[in-house]
From Swiss-Prot:
Belongs to the dystrophin family. Dystrobrevin subfamily. It comes from the Eukaryota. This is Dystrobrevin alpha. One of its GO terms (molecular function) is zinc ion binding. Keywords: Cell membrane, Coiled coil, Cytoplasm, Membrane, Metal-binding, Phosphoprotein, Synapse, Zinc, Zinc-finger. Interacts with dystrophin, utrophin and the syntrophins SNTA1, SNTB1, SNTB2, SNTG1 and SNTG2. Binds dystrobrevin binding protein 1. Interacts with MAGEE1. Interacts with Ctnnal1. The interaction is required for correct localization of both Ctnnal1 and Dtna. Residues 458-557 form a coiled coil. The coiled-coil domain mediates the interaction with dystrophin, alpha-catulin and utrophin. Pfam families: EF-hand_2 (PF09068), EF-hand_3 (PF09069), ZZ (PF00569). Residues 1-288 are annotated as: Interaction with MAGEE1. It comes from Mus musculus. Disruption phenotype: Increases alpha-catulin protein in mdx muscle. The gene is Dtna. A zinc finger (ZZ-type) spans 238-294.
Amino acid sequence: MIEDSGKRGNTMAERRQLFAEMRAQDLDRIRLSTYRTACKLRFVQKKCNLHLVDIWNVIEALRENALNNLDPNIELNVARLEAVLSTIFYQLNKRMPTTHQIHVEQSISLLLNFLLAAFDPEGHGKISVFAVKMALATLCGGKIMDKLRYIFSMISDSSGVMVYGRYDQFLREVLKLPTAVFEGPSFGYTEQSARSCFSQQKKVTLNGFLDTLMSDPPPQCLVWLPLLHRLANVENVFHPVECSYCHSESMMGFRYRCQQCHNYQLCQDCFWRGHAGGSHSNQHQMKEYTSWKSPAKKLTNALSKSLSCASSREPLHPMFPDQPEKPLNLAHIVPPRPVTSMNDTLFSHSVPSSGSPFITRSSPPKDSEVEQNKMLARAAPAFLKGRGIQYSLNVADRLADEHVLIGLYVNMLRNDPPCMLESSNRLDEEHRLIARYAARLAAESSSSQPTQQRSAPDISFTIDANKQQRQLIAELENKNREILQEIQRLRVEHEQASQPTPEKAQQNPTLLAELRLLRQRKDELEQRMSALQESRRELMVQLEGLMKLLKEEELKQGTQGASSPRSSPSHTISRPIPMPIRSASACPTPTHTPQDSLTGVGGDVQEAFAQSSRRNLRSDLLVAADSITNTMSSLVKELNSEVASETESTVDSEFSRPQFEDLAPSPTSEKAFLAQIHSRKPGYIHGGAASTTHGDMVPEDGDPYTQPEDGNYENESVRQLENELQLEEYLKQKLQDEAYQVSLQG
């Protein structure tokens, strides 16, 4: 009891959910009951996904659940009804593409609750088979003509004439649908509903039934049924016209044009809800349009009508024979399939139980007939192979093709004769049936021979086309498979290339060791280079200091020569000292030291080394030493040349050589060198007698000369020059030693 109450509560909640969503659409504001009812049923149809199912899918589901063999007045319980709905929606999902799959369980639940609310308001849990068929046929999608043909097959007799009692039952059941969406006062069932549609004194055939229900206007109680289908057909129709009330630039669905107001057009929402503006009134007559025609098309139609060359209007439906073809009684050969058979679906497509797709009346099956039914079902695929599923659906399912039955039976006889010839009576019946078919075909051969001659090539062409299509599909599938494999291979290669493998992570340890050693060696070389650059910068600073001293000495000598009474302008050392130049033998070599490494060094040294930023350290040191040596040598040569032009004594030729070894006296001959310089001064030659004689001094060349006694003559300039010469010699030796050590370390 608790479970039943819980299920009942869930059912009521789902019903309320569907109706609450319908009320949220604000459909009750539509002022016309016909449009209001059609819109509500259209909402239920789309919410339950029944607009994706046509009448043929419904018939197939009913046959799979054996409802075609049941009496229409038998009632189904909820479980059986749910099984029918499950068959419909699961088969629908198989036909739909994967991107448009529906929610099967939700659709089943919504439709089941709506049917229970419409046809079982008391909650008994049972619905008649006839009500289920009428509801599904009305709410499903597809053409209205096919649906009405199926409905007529359910309410007509074997002679093809409508039974008024069944039509009244049809109205009673189908009008429960508007009542379920709260439109019972407008379209509820009354006893006069059936009489208002057809006159009971007249026989109603299929053509009359279709003419009445598809006419314009249809019967008042069913006026919403054609509108429901027209609403579905124009749902996506576009009208490039502006609405005169809401001023929307385009319209979708129906379009309404006022017959009194000039160029006054309304969209379906404004017309349904009674919106009006300006001089327009809701009482004006409106014309409904389901499509858009350009002005040129309208002009063409008007000219065609005026010239009476317009084509006659096509009928609403094709004309069907008044007397339906009587189906053959094949109960003893092809009985109705049992419910428990596993081949029911295939057999229902290939061998129908009657000549009409809608009338399925037959006798209960027997055991022997059930076995024979299974054999026919197994033989059907072999016979219908290559003809396609459309052939089996359209021909076998709807028209009960006699040729298909004969072919199936002959195929069974050829494959398994003992099983089919169990009794002589059955054999006689089979021969009589075949003879009957042969006589009928012979009688129709004269009239149908051209058609058969044309149909044979058509069938062969269809078979060839199907074969080509299958081959093309197979080729495309193979190509698709190859493309997928290639994509997978490329993806694997990309992943392998992007992600390091364990082999790459664990390389050769020898290579790793060598790599570490190279990095250490690189660090050591960088440190040594930094040390060498620092040493070079210090040497350049020292060199700059020496050059400053030389310039200061030059200035001092020039000042003293101008102020001294014993000095003449020709004897003063006023010539500028030449700047250091690069040795021609020094070749530039690459170096990693930038020009900024001489930071703190004066401009003279930077100028001397500005062009040799890529020279190695050894060459730079040697060039610097050579430049200083050349400068001092030039100074000494100038001094010697000036003194030699004015002296009266003979000077040894070797003393005046420009070699550096003569210009740099040793410590033992320093006094002789200074005395010789003093003796060449003008003051020494023309001066008075010497007060003190130190004695003769022998220079390195062996020529004696006398040291002047005037000790004051050794002025500050001579002493400074002597000190500079000694310092220059010492610096040169030091630079050469450091360069040699650097070359040994490199």
